[in-house]
Amino acid sequence: RHARAGVVALRRPGSGGDTFEVTMPSDHAHVLGVVVQADGTDAEAAIEAALAAAPAWAALPFDQKAAIFLRAADLIAGPYRATMNAATMLGQGKTVQQAEIDSACELVDFLRYNVAYAQQIMSDQPDNAPGVWNRMEYRPLEGFVYAITPFNFTAIAGNLPAAPALMGKVVLWKPSPKAQFSAQGVMGLFT
């Protein structure tokens, strides 16, 4: 419940009024969608929503956060694989093979590796001397992470905001205007 509230709080379309068309790189007459540009008011609202969601998201046990990212990986690897590949092909002009590597295989790997490596990092603890107990605890940074992602790599665009979110940080994600089609697909898997 907290995770969904946090993600939904941040998934806000712009209300600034300015719009731009998302087109296929190989055919600019083929419009894939129209995006409403965020303005300063939208940015402030997103920051406020992120900061309001931060305590609940940080308090959510790691295993519950990890389950969200592992579920997204399973969805991308399974029933949403073709949709993610198609969005990457249409929006970024990639071939079938390039899209399969980028939006399916690598994004799934990133999400799963992030969980595995985070579990490993958190399980490593400093040595203890007799009569002394040392313990390392991980907690999120203060504030929020602002993730600006590239136009040409769906896997990196999905991973850049996912990694700090897995570790308990709230993230504002600004995907490239040229990658809105696949970014919408990635965000949809988390909501």
Residue ranges and their predicted role:
Residues 3-16, 60-69, 83-89, 99-103, ...:
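Short coil/turn segments at secondary-structure boundaries
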Residues 24-26, 35-39, 86, 92, ...:
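Active-site proximal loops enriched in glycine and acidic residues that flank catalytic Cys/His/Asp
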Residues 1-34:
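Hydrophobic face of amphipathic alpha-helices that form TPR/SEL1-like repeat modules
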Residues 37, 41-51, 55-56, 66-82, ...:
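Long amphipathic alpha-helix in the N-terminal Rossmann-like dinucleotide-binding domain
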Residues 89, 118-191:
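Rossmann-like NAD(P) dinucleotide-binding subdomain of oxidoreductase/dehydrogenase enzymes
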Residues 71, 87, 110-113, 185, ...:
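Alpha-helical scaffold segments in soluble metabolic enzymes
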Residues 29, 50, 65, 88, ...:
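Residue-level signal for inorganic ion chemistry
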